[in-house]
């Protein structure tokens, strides 16, 4: 498993991809609307400005392929658009929460390098003691296994002697 910083970087990359996909979906699937309340504002005038020649040609090609949409189909399309936006928003929220959890798991700014080294040293000592305990348990298991084998041999020998 990757360390927390690598996980955090991966999650941030995924979040950027989700933002990009969401903005792209909105740009390609939504109906144009005013950017603010004032229709004479600079942003609305710029948004309603005519497209450059090459984009106009592409738009006319796309426009000629479009068919008239019935009101029920348009309502379904709007519902589908809203559902997709809700799903994309939920994905972004979940990824943001995952990033927050990863950030919370990182050592704080107030944690000095010395205290981090002390924590690592303590964990290393704890690991060594657990490994020693594991070795002892393995030796105990081997001892019990040999004892069980000797009991089985004694029982088998006793049974064979009683049959002769």
Swiss-Prot record:
This is Mediator of RNA polymerase II transcription subunit 21. Pfam families: Med21 (PF11221). InterPro entries: Med7/Med21-like (IPR037212), Mediator_Med21 (IPR021384). Residues 114-146 form a coiled coil. The keyword Cytoplasm does not apply. GO terms for molecular function: RNA polymerase II-specific DNA-binding transcription factor binding; transcription coactivator activity; transcription corepressor activity. Residues 49-81 are annotated as: Disordered. Component of the Mediator complex, a coactivator involved in the regulated transcription of nearly all RNA polymerase II-dependent genes. Mediator functions as a bridge to convey information from gene-specific regulatory proteins to the basal RNA polymerase II transcription machinery. Mediator is recruited to promoters by direct interactions with regulatory proteins and serves as a scaffold for the assembly of a functional preinitiation complex with RNA polymerase II and the general transcription factors. It is found in: Nucleus. Residues 53-81 have a biased composition (Polar residues). The lineage of its organism: Eukaryota, Fungi, Dikarya, Ascomycota, Saccharomycotina. Belongs to the Mediator complex subunit 21 family.
């Amino acid at each position: 498993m990757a360390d927390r910083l690598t996980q955090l970087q991966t999650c941030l990359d995924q979040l950027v991809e989700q933002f990009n996909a969401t903005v792209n979906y909105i740009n390609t699937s939504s109906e144009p609307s005013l950017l603010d309340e004032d229709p004479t504002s600079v942003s609305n005038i710029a948004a309603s400005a005519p497209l450059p020649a090459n984009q106009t040609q592409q738009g006319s090609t796309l426009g000629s392929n479009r068919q008239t949409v019935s009101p029920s189909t348009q309502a379904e399309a709007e519902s589908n658009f809203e559902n997709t936006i809700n799903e994309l928003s939920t994905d972004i929220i979940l990824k943001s929460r995952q990033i927050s959890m990863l950030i919370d798991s990182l050592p704080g700014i107030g944690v000095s390098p010395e205290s981090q080294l002390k924590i690592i040293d303590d964990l290393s000592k704890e690991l060594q003691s657990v490994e020693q305990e594991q070795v002892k348990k393995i030796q105990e298991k081997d001892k019990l296994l040999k004892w069980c084998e000797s009991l089985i041999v004694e029982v088998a020998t006793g049974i064979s002697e009683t049959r002769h």
